[in-house]
Curated annotation (Swiss-Prot):
Active-site residues, as the UniProt record annotates them: 361
Gene3D superfamilies, A to Z: Nucleic acid-binding proteins, Vaccinia Virus protein VP39
GO term, biological process aspect, one: rRNA base methylation
Keywords: 4Fe-4S, Iron, Iron-sulfur, Metal-binding, Methyltransferase, S-adenosyl-L-methionine, Transferase
Name of the protein in its database record: Uncharacterized RNA methyltransferase TDE_2619
Classification via InterPro entries: MeTrfase_TrmA_AS, NA-bd_OB-fold, SAM-dependent_MTases_sf, U5_MeTrfase_fam
Length: 404
């Protein structure tokens, strides 16, 4: 097996550091940190790069620590526990901003990027919002082994690894893992969510319910909901600190209405677009339970309560509807990891919407879509990075775009 001594450079999105081999080829080394000298073995060759494995650390980064989790190197969940928490913040911010810089620099012929996005101070202007580094994750999908044990997906494998503890899980889920309870059906999967006290699964609860920023939000245990509740609340509070809502609001990829729910007191009209009919039904219920309780202040405005419209369709088909011709002063867009649908992005760029709040779980697709928005005349006024997923390379981005 080929071995070489290399010095790592920067960390790239995915949490591997890059280094150069003797022949000039780039090698990606997982579990390494920047500026370490390593003896590595080459484990996989590609046309333009290689993958390496650490055999020995010859010069150790001052930021390297022992992983807290005993399953770290086999579990497919975390990949940054080798760095201290503060340095992780720096690494995640660096990786996210590099993805943005790289995507925008591909459009060098468009001077708009130099003016709006590639200024030297952009790194300092981007706001990093942190929360708990451990005991934060409230949602898991576990595999049930043949003996009834809870397992998580094994790293780079179709297999699974039995989990006796998970230090990033909220205490209620950690206690469940430590109890070694084996009451679940072998050779199956189970979705588990905790509000910090209760454990919700598809077996013991039809609905999950949490309270965020004073609102009650219900969703299905099998459906999507954010896994870091404290950071979700910080995200919501930040959005509505900057939102200037006076008329019509569009909630794109709305899910259960998490963001538009908080626009109720200011908007005259709210449109939710979501392809998942089950999630949209929960959105309707969330507006109902909050408007009929103290969750939403129902002081009658001059123009009455806002009208709420639910559109069960995907982003690709939104532009074909008559409602897409309406003028919205605010759009919330929270797409899946693949980013905004091409057709939806085209509509958004030409919509004339005054302010767009783009929430993204992937800095790469956020950067790609940002390029299109900037070309169409929007300015990236604020850029936030919310540390939703400590101990991993993942991060949540909020971009606030405005057009005069």
């Amino acid at each position: 097996m080929q071995k070489e001594i290399v010095k790592t450079k920067k960390m790239v999105f995915g949490a591997s550091c890059i280094a150069s081999l003797k022949d000039g080829k780039t090698v990606f080394v997982p579990y390494s940190l920047p500026d370490e000298v390593l003896e590595i073995s080459i484990v996989k060759e590609h046309k333009n790069y290689t993958e390496g494995k650490i055999e020995k650390i010859l010069e150790v980064s001052p930021h390297r620590v022992e992983p807290r989790c005993p399953h770290f190197y086999v579990c497919g969940g975390c990949n940054l526990q080798t760095a201290d928490d503060e340095y992780q913040h720096f690494l995640r911010k660096s990786m996210a901003l590099e993805a943005l810089d790289r995507a925008l620099s591909l459009n060098k012929e468009k001077a708009v990027f130099e003016k709006q996005a590639l200024e030297k101070s952009f790194f300092e202007k981007s706001i990093f919002v942190s929360g708990p580094d451990w005991d934060y994750r409230a949602r898991f999908q576990f595999y049930i082994d043949k003996d009834g044990s809870l397992s998580l997906k094994e790293n780079k494998s179709s297999g699974s690894v039995k989990i006796k503890d998970c230090p990033i899980a909220v205490p209620a889920i950690r206690n469940l893992l430590k109890s070694n309870l084996k009451e679940y059906t072998p050779n199956s999967r189970i979705h588990i969510f905790s509000d910090g006290e209760k454990i919700f699964t598809q077996d013991n609860a039809k609905d999950c319910e949490v309270r965020l920023a004073g609102k009650r939000i219900k969703f299905n245990p099998l459906g999507f909901f954010q896994s870091n509740l404290e950071m979700t609340e910080k995200l919501i509070n930040t959005i509505f600190e900057y939102a200037e809502i006076s008329s019509s609001v569009l909630d794109f990829y709305s899910g259960v209405g998490t963001f538009s729910l908080f626009a109720y007191d200011q908007a005259k009209e709210i449109h939710l677009v979501e392809h998942n009919k089950h999630a949209l039904a929960y959105a309707q219920e969330n507006f109902l339970i909050n408007s009929s309780s103290s969750g939403i202040v129902r002081e009658k405005k001059e123009n009455g309560f806002p009208k709420i419209f639910y559109h069960a369709l995907d982003g690709k088909n939104w532009a074909k509807t008559k409602e897409s011709k309406l003028k919205f002063d605010t759009v919330f867009v929270d797409p899946p990891r693949i980013g905004i649908d091409k057709e939806a992005l085209s509509w958004l760029c030409s919509s004339g919407t005054r302010q767009i709040f783009y929430i993204s779980c992937d800095p790469v697709t956020f950067a790609r879509d940002t390029a299109s928005l900037l070309v169409s005349g929007y300015k990236l006024e604020k850029h936030f990075l919310f540390d939703f997923y400590p101990q991993t390379h993942h991060i949540e981005t909020l971009g606030i775009f405005r057009k005069n």
